[in-house]
Amino acid sequence: MVNPWVGPFEALTERVDADWAGVWALACTACQTLEVVQQTVLGAEDDWVLNLAGYFLVSAFLEVVDVHPEAAHSAETMNPRGLDFGDRDGALAAICLLLNGARRKLTQLAGHTELDLDDQLCALGMHRYLESAAVTIARMLNSRSASLN
């Protein structure tokens, strides 16, 4: 599986600060990427695994918006070149990279002692949903590659 986005997305995740804005940007990019896959890949909009991953992503956003309502208005994606993927599996692999990057930043963020309890709970809840989305997509990729062998 060739994925031209692995390098750029990995570099993006490393440059992001471990704060709410950074985590939010990574998650928004993953969410927009998933939407592009669902709109451009034949049959993807009816794929229950992708829909489940989308549900987990939306749930992660709701965790943040509940505590930080202003976040919904400041959502930014991190791909100025536009989203254009050669194949579905490459896009899904890129989404997993973004989600794993967001989870790493959340772990760092949750370790900050200056966060209040609401932010700590928000970080833990968002981490759980992002992990579920990443695992869901990774299982799909693994089962697809196993069926090709």
Where are these predicted regions, by residue range?
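Leu/Val/Ala/Ile-rich N-terminal alpha-helices, chiefly Sec-type signal peptides and the beginnings
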Residues: 1-48
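Surface-exposed peri-terminal alpha-helical interaction modules
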Residues: 2, 26, 45, 79-85, ...
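Generic structural signal for well-ordered, non-transmembrane alpha-helical segments
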Residues: 24, 28-35, 55-65, 93-100, ...
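Amphipathic protein-protein interaction modules
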Residues: 66-116
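Preference for long, well-ordered alpha-helical segments
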Residues: 98-149
